Amino acid sequence: MNIKLLTTTALIAGVAGAASAQELRFMCYSDGNECEVYDDVLTRFEAENEGLDVIVDVVPYQAILENLPVQLADGTGPDLAKVTDLGGLNEYYLDLAPYVDADYWNSSFGETLNWYRAGEGDEGIYGMHSQLTITGPFVNATLFEQAGVEMPGAGATWDEWAAAATEVAEATDADFPMAIDRSGHRVAGPAISYGAQLFDAEGNGQLVDDGFAAFAEQFVAWNEDGTMARDVWAGQGGSTYQDAAQEFINGELVFYYSGSWQVGRMDEQVGDFFDWQVVGSPCGPAGACSGMPGGAGIVGFAQTEHPEAVAKVIDYLASEEVYAEVTARTKNLPAHLGVASAGVDFEDASPAASAALTAFAADLANVSPIAFAYQGYAGNRAMFGITVERLSQAIVGELTVAEALERMTSDLEAAMAESQ
């Protein structure tokens, strides 16, 4: 087994062109230790499958978002990859169905298989959902205790959390009351909780309605008055992703809205520096208290020279025993229904991490049907990008909120026309 960190030059050039007929390239990004764990379990796979060599190319997440689609369009992509644009890359996917037990896959992965499909009528098997995620807040409980402020309880609203986090920050001199990752996916749950529908009556994607506008107004206002850590959104251009995990880890941030994939990182890097916990997504004026589901999956690409070998690798990772091991070692929520029903004994997880994963799993019941539909919508990547770019322009003052919303509408119309 070989695990490699790709340089910028290698990313631009692509990772295709295997040196031998037995070599497969697996483009992988990690939220925590996922690529390291895959490298380890695939070493065992190689021992059982002489002549197959799976090289794990570790890349930044931004490379998955930006470089991989370019490589695939040029025909220079890897054999398989860990992706998050599940439906958006469907045109490049290898259909695993001819090579795997479809009954096992359908019973094990259920509805998540639809997130990778082209749409109604497509029954192909394209991706193994490797980690189920849900967005939600991490809270610095130590800062609340030091401030003598009671933490809002179940069913608390975004306004109540903003007021409490601000009070805590002022009492403790913490740098930032709140932050939300710079991501269209991350703000979708809050927007839905404010009443955003995200689809029109015909089921086509739409961004701007009264609910979305209400959230946009409030989010921009919070960035202007210091409730939100402004530089998370204002410090980047275009639709570039930016999280605020380090600010939270450093103890500078009271309330951090991100997601379950961060649990392993928090467990490892916060340690006993302070007490942290996960709470349910706050509620909005529309009565919803929704996060966004999502996650990552491992897919093969039709341009590979070795489709049967690629399918064999992914099928191995999808086996219940291997999937359960990877889930336990990476501290992720399982999308495999058999693994989920059996329960996961998370490896070396602290009490805080175990409680956090339990809290995230429990909050899945509060996820709006709109959020599940949005996650599976093939046009969501364009909508995420438009959201980030135009909201950021409103935050930095390049546009008013009204102008930003107008641009979102025209941007989405153009994107949908281009995709036809």
Regions found by a protein language model. Name each.
Residues 22-31, 52-57, 79-80, 126, ...:
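Short, well-ordered beta-strand elements
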Residues 24-40, 59, 133, 375-379:
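Extracytoplasmic "Venus flytrap"
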Residues 32-53, 387, 405:
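Short, polar/charged alpha-helical segment
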Residues 47-48, 147, 224-228, 268-337:
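Extracytoplasmic/periplasmic substrate-recognition and gating elements
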Residues 84-134:
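Hinge/lid segment of periplasmic solute-binding proteins
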Residues 165-166, 204-237, 267, 281:
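Glycine-centered hinge/linker elements that transmit conformational signals in sensory
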Residues 261-264, 300-381:
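Mature extracytoplasmic/periplasmic domains
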Residues 355-413:
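C-terminal capping/gating helix-and-loop segments adjacent to ligand/active sites or protein-protein/ligand interfaces
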